[in-house]
Amino acid sequence: MKLLRFDPQLCTLCGACIDKCPFGAITMEKTGITLNENCRMCGVCVRQCQSKALYFEQKAGGEDKSTWNGILVYAEQERGKMHPVVFELIGEARKLAKKVGYKVYAVMVGTARTAENAKELLPYGVDEVFVYEHEGFAGFKADCYADAVADCISKLHPSVVLVGGTSLGRSLAPRLSTRFHTGLTADCTKLEMKSNTDLVQIRPAFGGNIMAQIVISESRPQFATVRYKVMDRAEKVEKPSGKITVCPVSEDMVRSRIEVLSAKVLEHVRSIEEEDVLVVAGRGAGKALDQLKELAELLGGQLCFTRP
């Protein structure tokens, strides 16, 4: 596994790497350059660095898998309520954990009542819920949420981290996998656990023509986002024995580098993932869209569209 390294002693602060980075992943700070989660390990900066301050280091032998165990579910809240994908993730986590003797954990980040909402997860067989509750988490700021979840991962060392394939989850998961220099498989539709704790992540590829099987064999944790409504919802257990742990939140953790200039609360509209009935229109629908919209309303569903 390759890791991108920076030697501040060799850096001349020429800025060539910043100018050439195609992803805007390098910024200049007082102490030198820093790399953020936009880095794709493409190597452009390494080739541009004349002083050899940036270089790739080959990590030998991979992670010691025995030091990483358990499955961590990111429990997303939507407008103060638990997102339904969380219960699907817990159900899948319990199935995977049973095969290798793991425990199932959850982590929640939010404002007031987050710890109260965490109680909803215990009846579904979660062994421990880690809660990061602070008013500074009001409104989703990807950097702050990533700091909180990364803190949990660093302390817990889970072998697998499952995140819902929502808009929030798709923003959060890549930041986390980059921080831990490990892999991420997005939009999984099926998960399997090997006896050696490698997670087989299955997802459609090439427009759904094939199903790709992806394994992160040399690094931990293993990150995967899972599409909503493709896994079975978790069943409640007879005797819940889990607990809730409220974690300390530092001021740095809630100090965001993102400045919100304005915000507008939109009326909640059901997403197509939540609908039981969909009327789908393609490019050829033309002037029939009004009729299709009326049909969707009569059927109690929603009108949606294919790719252009």
Give residue ranges: language-model regions.
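N-terminal glycine-rich FAD/FM-binding segment characteristic of electron-transfer flavoproteins
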Residues: 1-308
